[in-house]
Amino acid sequence: MKEGEIFGLLGPNGAGKSTTMEIIETLRKKTSGKVIVDGIDLDTDPGKIKKIIGVQLQTSGFYPGLTLLELIALFSGLYNQPVNAYELLELVNLQEKAKSKYKEMSGGQKQRFSIATTLINKPKIIFLDEPTTGLDPQARRNLWDLVRSIRDKGTTVIITTHYMDEAEQLCDRVAIMDEGKIIALQTPDKLIDDLVASGFEKPKITKAANLEDVFIQLTGKDFKDD
């Protein structure tokens, strides 16, 4: 994985995506191989790796009765890292929800907040495990914009997803895994071009738009995810 890119891990269920992520995140012991994160060897100094990464919590990892400000203060204390909560919330367009309770957030807002918490310790790398699962099309695209903005500020993003359109639109490079092994590693465009060059064909789609485009055109507003 290269510094400053959005890197996607793709594969069917059971391929090893989440296991690979958990090993790199120091949450699971590896059985073989070597893991180097920003020049740090996982075997010799996992503590240093923990200091430079941010891991997205699932929605069940937050206290529902606390406000967003209270949750940020909690995580800031755990990391022993002072943070301007309003600036952090502004980054994910939740500044107006600062004093709202977590349980009052919509699905898209909860996902954006969970990404915000990965940035509290100012990490070099963040890990997002299927961050758009369950979101409507507009909320998904808004989250893509957020992930790109984080990448553009210099943070490396590692993401797993089952949505191939998401990987194609969002990722600079992807690794396709199957049965615990990487079977392809390249940019989405290069993988597609190689497949076409091999003689692959499918019926051409003649319409210039699809139902998702209609949905977003009719309902879409910036960060509309209620």
PLM region descriptions:
Residues 33-41, 48-49:
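Conserved ABC transporter NBD signature motif
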Residues 73, 77, 82-97:
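Conserved ABC ATPase "signature" region
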Residues 101-105:
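Conserved ABC ATPase signature
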Residues 122:
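Conserved catalytic motifs of ABC-family nucleotide-binding domains
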Residues 126-130:
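Catalytic Walker B motif of ABC-type/P-loop ATPase nucleotide-binding domains
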Residues 185-186:
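ABC ATPase "signature
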